[in-house]
Curated annotation (Swiss-Prot):
One of its GO terms (biological process) is symbiont-mediated suppression of host innate immune response. A motif (LXCXE motif, interaction with host RB1 and TMEM173/STING) lies at residues 96-100. Belongs to the adenoviridae E1A protein family. InterPro entries: Aden_E1A. This is Early E1A protein. It is found in: Host nucleus. Residues 180-203 are annotated as: Disordered. Plays a role in viral genome replication by driving entry of quiescent cells into the cell cycle. Stimulation of progression from G1 to S phase allows the virus to efficiently use the cellular DNA replicating machinery to achieve viral genome replication. E1A protein has both transforming and trans-activating activities. Induces the disassembly of the E2F1 transcription factor from RB1 by direct competition for the same binding site on RB1, with subsequent transcriptional activation of E2F1-regulated S-phase genes and of the E2 region of the adenoviral genome. A motif (PXDLS motif, CTBP-binding) lies at residues 238-242. It comes from Human adenovirus F serotype 40 (HAdV-40). Residues 38-46 are annotated as: Interaction with RB1 in competition with E2F1. Residues 74-131 are annotated as: Interaction with UBE2I. A zinc finger (unnamed) spans 145-165. Residues 181-193 have a biased composition (Acidic residues).
Amino acid sequence: MRMLPDFFTGNWDDMFQGLLETEYVFDFPEPSEASEEMSLHDLFDVEVDGFEEDANQEAVDGMFPERLLSEAESAAESGSGDSGVGEELLPVDLDLKCYEDGLPPSDPETDEATEAEEEAAMPTYVNENENELVLDCPENPGRGCRACDFHRGTSGNPEAMCALCYMRLTGHCIYSPISDAEGESESGSPEDTDFPHPLTATPPHGIVRTIPCRVSCRRRPAVECIEDLLEEDPTDEPLNLSLKRPKCS
């Protein structure tokens, strides 16, 4: 406490009054006249004396020509005027051509290889615009059919057929109720034949005819518990809807 100044040992009013009277606490340096007059634009455009020739002067002038700077300044001055309408800018011819080197040219051997692959793949390729799929129904299925020729040229399979010709050739195997008789065997017994038996009113021996059953639509009688459903009702009486359902205890 002995090292502290006198104004820190008193009460708060004395301390505050001592801070106000102290000179070095609020002794800020006054700004110089040069700093008040200089602006950011002046600091940016400061010309350094002593360097008469600059090696980068030409490069800087090429990037920012004086014509563009003068046009920008004139546009800014005209825009800040009272009329509010600036002068029309003059068109400037800019070189937008790219002078960078692109990808290296391809190897001629690679071009020859790709051309050979394309020529080899041309026979297997079918242009759909030139050879369109047209449905046809010739007298003989699979012969002289334009649809079959289209599928054969596309797939490369000389035996390919269209769906219509295939159905016409194999339709009897699908839509006939009974296959055609292939002839009786040497023994003459009908059991040895592979074709199915003819459809008759009486089924063959060993085949049980299905009997249609009518589904009952009557309601199940009310029960007191679920175990009653498992027991068979000997009376099997119909449900009497005039009676009230018994209450479950």
